[in-house]
């Protein structure tokens, strides 16, 4: 027992020796509060060497050591000295600590250089809002906007550590402040912005910029790139090459995306010259905290190029005449074929409406299809597909036999007791003979008919390899008791027949009975009524687009593009729900134009006034097709400042709606008539003062079918000083015209009209027609009623036929079975129904006469009758309108030349009118035409694709017989930069 007490005493001596005692800090306590700029002294006493540390920092300034005691002295304390100070016994690592507060009356929270807090999702985030006074109470975390904290956010407040947010989530991101109460006063820290970086939840996704299989020829270069992203930078990306392949160079790149600090990595494997042994699987591996992802590419290296064909159809095909047949060939090739063609019996085939050739390629597969539309007998034969890529070639042949119906081509008899029947068809017709007692009846369909098989001689007269086989059959007549003999030719289940009368018999019948006569008469009357109704229906005018786009010229004949065949780009589609309709701008027999507000047309927050074309609810399918054709033509033409441009369309989920620019001043004709009283005339050759022009009653009324003006017309005399100043600023470029007052500058209804305005209208219409001509487009109804005006008195050419009732419009005269604007038509259009670019030039001359007569009707006082037509043929032309300068009348006369070839093209007209414009007007037009047009969202890119159109010289064309404008699939949208104006 005494032995145990001795062991216990010894162990206690070793356990509680003086060197293991904990250091002591003076002053005592858990914390010390020091005033701002006051001295601070801390002493640490221990058995051995002591050292001061501050929050794990190994060194602290101001420390002195003497005989196992370490003193820390700070002469002027400030908030930067706040924190936990640790006294460490260097040998035993025993420690004691104390927290120092430095009271700052102006800053209840220590100022921090850190305002942006970055944390990983799932980690804890520390907001370093340290209190300078331990008496601060109710330390809380709030958002800077005083909104409620995010759902699920938990935090721990501490005067020494600030606020610790636990398990941070992406939804916690935002601005936070620390608040508390100090001496009955609410205090708050400065703002802290918390950013939470997400952590991956799955292995990375690899995007490969290469097909699953890559084929190369020896010594070609190999580039394989794989990409991946990760929410942080802890990701690895590498390539693994197959065994036996040559060393490959791998280039890597890394960048941080602005979205959520996502890091994007890419790795590119490069072999400058591949070898056969490089064939194999190349694997890209990406690794993050959640695992590894792989994507692989198989590389095949060949000595030279190859081609392997795989015909979809059998080599020999039979098809009925009139049916269509699709021949398909699929090729695996590398490189892709340089040449591929179809031929028929050794003659090359081209893409036509009867032979439609379609080619497709994907990676290393090339396919070609030949569609034979409604095969004819003459199209039976051998079709061959050939392709080559320089290293290899393929040749595949299809043998096509066209099955035709049987046809009795000749028959004779009975002659000398024998009848003869000749039939043709493919395959060779099978001829059979039948006897029956019924006269003039098909014996083969009778129950008691007899088939003749013994006395029949059948021979083949003609049997080409491809085409109809001609077969002759003869039969000896030996059965006098039968009255009818039938020859039946059969091919593939189809029959043709002819009947022979064996003996002449008088058969009584009541062919012309009263009942039969009455039935035939009623049928004839009914047919006559149907013919009349059909004629009346065909005479009824139908809606069609006036603008015609030329595809080619054959001699002096035009070939127009079928607008139904033009493509419709669905990027022009606009949601119906974003349209709010207003008043009707114009209404006609077929449809109407309605003012509407489009929301989100240019951008998501935009609101734009537009004009919407639509058909009436009673529209027929042909009229719906015509409106769709007009939409496709507008897409094809593209944008120009002097035509009414397309903005969008609604073709899905309801009736077709065509959305175009809204022209606030209506049509030019009514605008000119409305401005007559305030017109200011000045001519180059004489002085002319302000005039009031009395409205002629027959011209003063607004057109019944015109485009409604959406701004109030000026009343009284608008020649006030303010109008003069506005006009002067518009013409001379004074500082009155500001970008911020653009709407005020364009309030043109309050301004008068002068000769410079008329020249501007003439110039703008000529520019628009020059653009349409460059697109090989003929207008066919160019007149002031089809010119609209918008802000800034910008003239825009349109086709307003949809909203005009030509049956009630006196400008359209009945000629044949159509209503035509005869007074605007050229002689060749009136007498020969020929519409050309030059006929549009003639109509433009009439339009000039309308402009400089301020809206008078052409050929005033002359009805359209036989005398009118005679005068036009004899060369009668109108005199100069009252307000036309001499040069403008000379342009009119040149437009009215009897020889279409002598009429100036619109390019020359533009040059001549531009010489008469003032520099101010030119400058204004250049400003307008150089502006970027308002394009709907998503159309800018699509509008960059254009079809290269080359204008034709229409009249008296001496070119080769055919000059196609559109080659098969080369129909695209009009390109960008339609608003650049070249100055002459």
Swiss-Prot record:
<feature type="active site" description="Proton acceptor">
    <location>
        <position position="781"/>
    </location>
</feature>
<dbReference type="GO" id="GO:0030183">
    <property type="term" value="P:B cell differentiation"/>
</dbReference>
<feature type="modified residue" description="Phosphotyrosine; by autocatalysis">
    <location>
        <position position="560"/>
    </location>
</feature>
<feature type="compositionally biased region" description="Polar residues">
    <location>
        <begin position="944"/>
        <end position="960"/>
    </location>
</feature>
<dbReference type="InterPro" id="IPR013098">
    <property type="entry name" value="Ig_I-set"/>
</dbReference>
<feature type="domain" description="Ig-like C2-type 3">
    <location>
        <begin position="203"/>
        <end position="300"/>
    </location>
</feature>
<feature type="binding site">
    <location>
        <begin position="586"/>
        <end position="593"/>
    </location>
    <ligand>
        <name>ATP</name>
    </ligand>
</feature>
<feature type="disulfide bond">
    <location>
        <begin position="421"/>
        <end position="487"/>
    </location>
</feature>
<feature type="compositionally biased region" description="Low complexity">
    <location>
        <begin position="711"/>
        <end position="723"/>
    </location>
</feature>
<dbReference type="InterPro" id="IPR007110">
    <property type="entry name" value="Ig-like_dom"/>
</dbReference>
<feature type="binding site">
    <location>
        <position position="558"/>
    </location>
    <ligand>
        <name>Mg(2+)</name>
    </ligand>
</feature>
<feature type="region of interest" description="Disordered">
    <location>
        <begin position="711"/>
        <end position="749"/>
    </location>
</feature>
<keyword id="KW-0832">Ubl conjugation</keyword>
<feature type="glycosylation site" description="N-linked (GlcNAc...) asparagine">
    <location>
        <position position="476"/>
    </location>
</feature>
<keyword id="KW-0812">Transmembrane</keyword>
<keyword id="KW-0325">Glycoprotein</keyword>
<feature type="glycosylation site" description="N-linked (GlcNAc...) asparagine">
    <location>
        <position position="260"/>
    </location>
</feature>
<keyword id="KW-0393">Immunoglobulin domain</keyword>
<feature type="binding site">
    <location>
        <position position="785"/>
    </location>
    <ligand>
        <name>ATP</name>
    </ligand>
</feature>
<dbReference type="GO" id="GO:0005524">
    <property type="term" value="F:ATP binding"/>
</dbReference>
<comment type="similarity">
    <text>Belongs to the protein kinase superfamily. Tyr protein kinase family. CSF-1/PDGF receptor subfamily.</text>
</comment>
<dbReference type="GO" id="GO:0038093">
    <property type="term" value="P:Fc receptor signaling pathway"/>
</dbReference>
<feature type="disulfide bond">
    <location>
        <begin position="44"/>
        <end position="87"/>
    </location>
</feature>
<feature type="glycosylation site" description="N-linked (GlcNAc...) asparagine">
    <location>
        <position position="314"/>
    </location>
</feature>
<feature type="modified residue" description="Phosphotyrosine; by autocatalysis">
    <location>
        <position position="707"/>
    </location>
</feature>
<feature type="glycosylation site" description="N-linked (GlcNAc...) asparagine">
    <location>
        <position position="395"/>
    </location>
</feature>
<dbReference type="Pfam" id="PF25305">
    <property type="entry name" value="Ig_PDGFR_d4"/>
</dbReference>
<keyword id="KW-0479">Metal-binding</keyword>
<feature type="transmembrane region" description="Helical">
    <location>
        <begin position="515"/>
        <end position="535"/>
    </location>
</feature>
<feature type="disulfide bond">
    <location>
        <begin position="129"/>
        <end position="178"/>
    </location>
</feature>
<dbReference type="Pfam" id="PF07679">
    <property type="entry name" value="I-set"/>
</dbReference>
<dbReference type="GO" id="GO:0030335">
    <property type="term" value="P:positive regulation of cell migration"/>
</dbReference>
<dbReference type="InterPro" id="IPR003598">
    <property type="entry name" value="Ig_sub2"/>
</dbReference>
<dbReference type="GO" id="GO:0046872">
    <property type="term" value="F:metal ion binding"/>
</dbReference>
<feature type="glycosylation site" description="N-linked (GlcNAc...) asparagine">
    <location>
        <position position="227"/>
    </location>
</feature>
<dbReference type="InterPro" id="IPR001245">
    <property type="entry name" value="Ser-Thr/Tyr_kinase_cat_dom"/>
</dbReference>
<dbReference type="Pfam" id="PF07714">
    <property type="entry name" value="PK_Tyr_Ser-Thr"/>
</dbReference>
<feature type="glycosylation site" description="N-linked (GlcNAc...) asparagine">
    <location>
        <position position="448"/>
    </location>
</feature>
<dbReference type="InterPro" id="IPR020635">
    <property type="entry name" value="Tyr_kinase_cat_dom"/>
</dbReference>
<dbReference type="GO" id="GO:0043235">
    <property type="term" value="C:receptor complex"/>
</dbReference>
<feature type="signal peptide">
    <location>
        <begin position="1"/>
        <end position="21"/>
    </location>
</feature>
<feature type="binding site">
    <location>
        <position position="799"/>
    </location>
    <ligand>
        <name>Mg(2+)</name>
    </ligand>
</feature>
